[in-house]
Amino acid sequence: QPVFATKGLDDSIRLKASWCKGGRTRVIPITSEHQRAVLAKAHALAGSGSMIPPDKKYVTWLSTYKEATRVIGARKLHGLRHGYAQQRFESLAGFKAPAAGGPTRVELTLEQKQADYRARMQISAELGHGREEITAVYLGR
């Protein structure tokens, strides 16, 4: 439901708790023109309805979605979360996450450690977690 997700928002999308892992509502920032273009396509495709075509059941559409993500190189659906977290980390911290080939925690300056922590807390919230420790799964240490 792209209309619900973007209603009244210019710089983010709102995800219903029922759409999300862990049942937590999320607000995800829109940070690029590419994201805006994808959202425009989603609006055009779904209109005021769902991204799942009316003639398809959720289970059927999920298998189509899984195949599409596999084709683009995301071996599992969770891989999309990893990719998002790593890209978002680089944009917030100013350097790559360890899991993406960036420096490990022991290699960071004090200023970089502070940027690392702020970025991890932001990403943790965006992914629906409440603590920095969970970001190690997505970003490495």
Which residue stretches match the model-derived regions?
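Extended hydrophobic-aromatic, low-complexity segments
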Residues: H78, A97-P98, T135
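Conserved tyrosine-mediated DNA breakage-rejoining catalytic core shared by Y-recombinases
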Residues: Q1-K41
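C-terminal catalytic core of tyrosine-transesterase DNA break-rejoin enzymes
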Residues: G83-H129
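Extended amphipathic secondary-structure runs
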Residues: L62, K66-R70, A74, R120-R141
